[in-house]
Each structure stands twice: as structure tokens, then as C-alpha cells.
């Protein structure tokens, strides 16, 4: 998929029975993080969906790890903007395959991925037919304020990427 001139990597799993004569519904899977990464390998949840006839596209939108520091920092202090554009563009990418039913594309994710589900449904309501938010963050201000002091390095990393709740309240609400 690509958005705003940037190629966005991902992993696409095709159900065995999907074909141009029998197009499959599809889900865009957004990993947790932010800064996480979807990788090739076994995932019970994804395998379950594919076994039940869903195409699953695991997007590594801008801000994902594993593609260099520049790519990783492209969404710093801008979550729900271009990263959301990446996710919406992946729907168009999926609809381009004749073995995918372009009228039945949803979005699924947990943690940061769940936040992206909520953002897609709120800010791009026509993009997806369904959204599945698995324990997604819907209140970044509360989440960032609740990080315990013994998670200092992780807290600092999240503040750099998402914002400091003491100084970036307007953007985080």
C-alpha cells in the first residue's frame, strides 16, 4: 500500500478458498505499539481469521519499527494523522485484488492498533464496514499519566512519540 508518496509495507494472507469467483472479505490488522511491527510467522488470531475465510493485511504503517529510524519517527507527535492515512490507503490496496471483496473490508487491532480502529471509525467513517477494537487506547492523556515511575525509559519513549501529558494536553485530548 502507499499513501502520501510513501510505500507502506505489510503482510497479506489469502484464504485458500478465495478467488475472483469467490472473493473474500478482508481485514486490515494494525499492530500494537505504537512503534510495534507485524512480522511473518505464526499468529493464532490471524490464522484463525484466514482459516475462516478472511484475507488479513498486517500493515506496518509509518511509525512501525524495523524499517529504519526515519520511518519509525514519521508519526512522532502526529498519531491519527498520516498513520491513519496509511491504514485507510490499505483498504484501497486490498480492494485492488480480484480475490478480495472490496465492499467487505474491516479494520482490527489491539492497544495502539485498537486506537487506530477507533480513529478510523471516528475520522474516516466511510473507509471500513466494520471495526474491531481489541483493548485499544481511547484516552492517551489518561494512559500516559498512568505510566508508573519504574517504567521510566518506556515512559520517556512514549512521551517523545505521543507527547507529555503535562505539556501536550490539548493535543492528547
Go through the PLM ranges and name each one.
Residues 24, 54, 128-129:
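Short beta-strand segments enriched for Tyr within beta-sheet-rich domains
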Residues 40-60, 72:
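Short amphipathic alpha-helix adjacent to the substrate-entry channel of hydrolases
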Residues 32-36, 56:
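Serine-hydrolase catalytic-loop signature spanning alpha/beta hydrolases and amidase-signature enzymes
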